[in-house]
Structures are given as C-alpha cells and as structure tokens.
C-alpha cells in the first residue's frame, strides 16, 4: 500500500471508526462500506473534513447483487456505489451502501452534498428502482414515462413486458404485450477444410 493510501486508510478509520462496516484495498483503490443510516453523514464528512477533501463525486450507480458470483448470496440485494475524487489530495475513494429493504430499496439522497449526484440518482432509480430519500425530482430519466419495471434488475425479462409500435389505424404510437416468441438457439459450428492443424498436412 502506498504512503498516500495508508494515510487515507488511517484517516478513515480514525474519523469514522465503527461507522465503517468494511475497508478494503484492491487494485490501488480503497473501498469502504457504510450502513444506510450513516450514509449521508459519512458522505458530508468526506466532502467537508480537511483530512479527506473529496470535493468531486465522479460517479454513482446502482448494483443488483442477487445471485452474486452464481453462488448463494447472503447479503442485501441492492447497493449504491459512489466514486469520489479529491483533487487537492490526489486520491480516490469508493463508497458502497446497501439498501436495507429489498422490497422497497432506498438510501438517502446526496444531492445536497454534491449537486452532480442528481441525474446519477435518477438513473439508479430508473434502472434499479432504488429510491433516494430527499431527492427533489426523482423521476425516470432513461426509460419511457409508461415503462413498467426497472430494466437493470437481474429478474427483469430480457424481452421486457411491453413493446411500442406505431399503429397506422390510430395514427399514434401504442403499447402492446411483447410479441417475441421464445426460441431455442442451436449452436452451429462451421469449419473450413483449411481450418486448424489439418491445413498443414
């Protein structure tokens, strides 16, 4: 671990203590996990405290951990992952918070901490259904207004629930149930006579 990351790691442990559920170093970056109840105050401190100085939030996304690693995942299903940058200290940090309720996943909004979180939180809401408590304009940003469900959830059907098409009789775009019929793909192997070792005699 570099001296810079060692300093950041010590600062995090000293300042937050038990609020850190985990602190891991991988690929030259530190990832911390905090509880949903502590998320907002931790994020505010990461921006405001001189020991951290994370003035930029560079990314925020949702994650669906169901069947994580194709094993039996015992943890919570939905998480929010935030990437922070301190230009002054030249270090980065990844913060992960799990939503406690799988039926209605929600965490605090950090739009009052970093205004740039606004559309990122709307995207995570739209694609994963994670609600951000305190967000003043939490509405869909990528899918259509009448879209049903959240398409990045692992249990969302690949073909979706409805499809849109233009109806010339009604002279407008309409929604209808998906008409794609499931099919089985048969793998085909096409080999030329000159393929592989047989081409060299």
Curated annotation (Swiss-Prot):
PANTHER family: NADH DEHYDROGENASE [UBIQUINONE] IRON-SULFUR PROTEIN 3, MITOCHONDRIAL (PTHR10884:SF14), NADH DEHYDROGENASE UBIQUINONE IRON-SULFUR PROTEIN 3 (PTHR10884). It comes from Dechloromonas aromatica (strain RCB). This is NADH-quinone oxidoreductase subunit C. InterPro entries: NADH_DH_suC, NADH_quin_OxRdtase_su_C/D-like, NADH_UbQ_OxRdtase_30kDa_su, NADH_UbQ_OxRdtase_CS. It comes from the Bacteria. It is found in: Cell inner membrane. The keyword Ion transport does not apply. The lineage of its organism: Bacteria, Pseudomonadati, Pseudomonadota, Betaproteobacteria, Rhodocyclales. Keywords: Cell inner membrane, Cell membrane, Membrane, NAD, Quinone, Translocase, Transport, Ubiquinone.
